[in-house]
Amino acid sequence: MTTIDPHPRGAAPFDTSGTFRDEQGVAHYADLPSSLVEMFRATVRDHPGQEALVEVDGERLTYQQLWDRAARVAGGLRAAGVERGDRVANLLPAGVGWVLGFLGTQLAGAVAVPVNIRFAQPEIDYVLADSGAKTVLRPEAPLPDGEPYAAGDLQIDELAAIFYTSGTTGFPKGAMTTHENFLSNVETVLRVHGIDRAEGPRQRNLISVPLFHVTGCNTQLLVQIALGGTTVVLPAFHVRPFLRTIVDERINVLTSVPAIYALALSQPDFADFDVRAVTRVGYGGSPIAPSLVERIKAAFPQARVGNGFGLTETSSIATYLPHEWATEHTDSVGFAAPVVDLALHEPDSAGVGELLIRGPNVVAGYWNKPEATDRTFAGSWLHSGDLARIDEDGLVHVVDRAKDMINRGGENVYSVEVENALASAPGVADAAVVGVPDDVLGEKVGAVVVAASEDERLSVPAVLDHLAASLADFKIPQYVHVRTEPLQRNPGGKLLKRQLREQTAWGAPVRGR
């Protein structure tokens, strides 16, 4: 097998102390807890009376209450026949019940299977069958309840959860997430943000994205449990409750997708909401316009901002763009995380190749998919499917998904580049770029554009003129479809381009070339 050399870390500013490499060359954090259960146990010991979990318009639990309730769920699962390593599917909505189900599964020594409740029924049925779930936690049934139980001998390399990918093509695949995967991501979040554990109990984090996705679960909920901070869960996103909760719950940590920030900042009375408590704003999941970064900084003047990039297969964060770099490098997803190695597979003359990722955050493979595992996780490297370049500073620039690159008569057009240009065009709130079949060129460039206002007609010529100032002619869309309804995205904020290709009626081209 060909040896792959990691790309130099460049100017990456993150702390890499207390790490080591195994015989395969994979880096690890040296002093992690042995499992999520031990991490949770330590926080309950140190901060039993600290507020742990708040469901907006629902229950509030301290860490001791959270442990006691989760231990009873674990006891109920064990009484129902769930054993170590069995899968427990979680179909509960976001809130206290979901968290108790997830933590109770961990305390039982079982494997959590968070299910995307937005999946169509055939997809849900597939996940339940493929995972071999022994028990399914459903909203219409009470949580399991029994004598308190907490597994005490779990190992760091044991399977802790199976997160099913959002399935932008075909049925989803189950990413096998170990305790080390979870714990490594927690440590990474602390290091890339420069968080002092002593400040943990003062943190109040609002989760506005799904808990069944790694951003909500791994990078927010579990990080706060590690710190002894408070997790506030918004059961469903609506912009007014989102803003009210920031104020009412004194939220100081936000992590969400760009579309949510854009919607919140577009509220005419945003200035009436006192958001001065917010000291950290994270974003990711989709490209972000430079203008939106500036608006976020202006709206949250006390906050450090940053862009996180990762996949279900990396347990969330693989790279991070910190505050000091966030304004001048909005086209970058940042530097490799402290224990993450990056490489480019078969880069072209422009330095663009498939992004390869290696680290203790990379999952153990796909459940029940040995061929897909061998193909995607070859030689300890995750083949991400993202096309990227890495500059001399070590900053990663994701230019497209490999399957979304448009080949226009032999010219490669990276859809993300065009989408970024569209994001700053007048009257454009959101945009997606896809290939449109063409008999002569093979593909032409098509853009689906969401108008910023339903009251004002979007000027397509003005948008094209804007693009001409920054893009080569062959990259400017020949087809533009304007709509007012939001674009379809998966729970991680990524565009569902297959649906857009299938559902968009393009009409006549807006330009001839």
Kindly give the residue locations of the regions a language model identified.
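Gly/Ser/Thr-rich phosphate-binding loop
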Residues: 226, 251-256, 267-328, 341
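Conserved ATP/PPi-binding loop(s) of AMP-dependent carboxylate-activating enzymes
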Residues: 335-339, 347-376, 411-413
